[in-house]
């Protein structure tokens, strides 16, 4: 099972505050474990604009018509002071990994220097922190009915209203997440 470029959709019974009603975009999944970013948990009072101001990033070619007041997401409980930028593919950044034909992840400052300019990727989602699973841990959580999985849809990552992402990701499976009982059993 390789879940790279998939969504993990928290089951209604998952009560961990970081992951309750969350959608995690899996950036990497291999024999050693998995790494992903929560895409639907905004950090209150933190926008892309505020992050750029704090880092004193102000490119000369900034286009003020570009909305930088987008919220920054909490990507997960690990390395919460590190930025991870999901974006549509655009070459030239120093620390980027292509995840799919539609998504890349970049962790280097050079991508931040393009935000709000004609040089930025077409679509972006900025997160602070990430989540990861050790070898076999994610598979175990899926077997325990903590997560639903489905192929990722970049439209949900970049365009869907944040409050709708959990429901919309589940609808990719043809289900209404609100109709799932909080406790699942095994037959």
Swiss-Prot record:
Q: Which residues cross the membrane?
A: none
Q: Which residues form a coiled coil?
A: none
| InterPro entries, per the entry | AlgH-like (IPR003774)
Q: What is this protein called?
A: UPF0301 protein plu1183
Q: Which cellular component terms (GO) are annotated to the entry?
A: cytosol
Protein family (similarity comment) = Belongs to the UPF0301 (AlgH) family.
User: Which top-level group of life is the source organism from?
Assistant: Bacteria
């Amino acid at each position: 099972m390789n879940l790279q470029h998939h969504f993990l959709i928290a089951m209604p019974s998952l009560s961990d505050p970081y992951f309750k009603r969350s959608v995690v975009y899996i950036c990497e999944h291999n024999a050693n474990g998995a790494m992903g970013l929560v895409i639907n948990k905004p950090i209150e009072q933190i926008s892309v604009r505020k992050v750029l101001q704090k880092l004193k990033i102000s490119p000369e070619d900034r286009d003020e018509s570009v909305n930088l007041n987008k919220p920054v997401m909490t990507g997960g409980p690990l390395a919460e002071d590190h930025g991870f930028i999901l974006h549509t593919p655009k070459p030239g950044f120093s620390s980027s990994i292509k995840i799919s034909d539609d998504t890349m992840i970049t962790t280097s400052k050079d991508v931040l220097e393009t935000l709000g300019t004609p040089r930025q990727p077409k679509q972006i989602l900025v997160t602070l922190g990430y989540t990861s699973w050790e070898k076999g841990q994610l598979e175990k959580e899926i077997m325990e009915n903590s997560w639903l999985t489905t192929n990722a849809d970049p439209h949900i990552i970049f365009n869907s209203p944040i409050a709708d992402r959990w429901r919309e990701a589940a609808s990719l499976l043809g289900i209404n997440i609100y109709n799932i009982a909080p406790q699942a059993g095994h037959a």
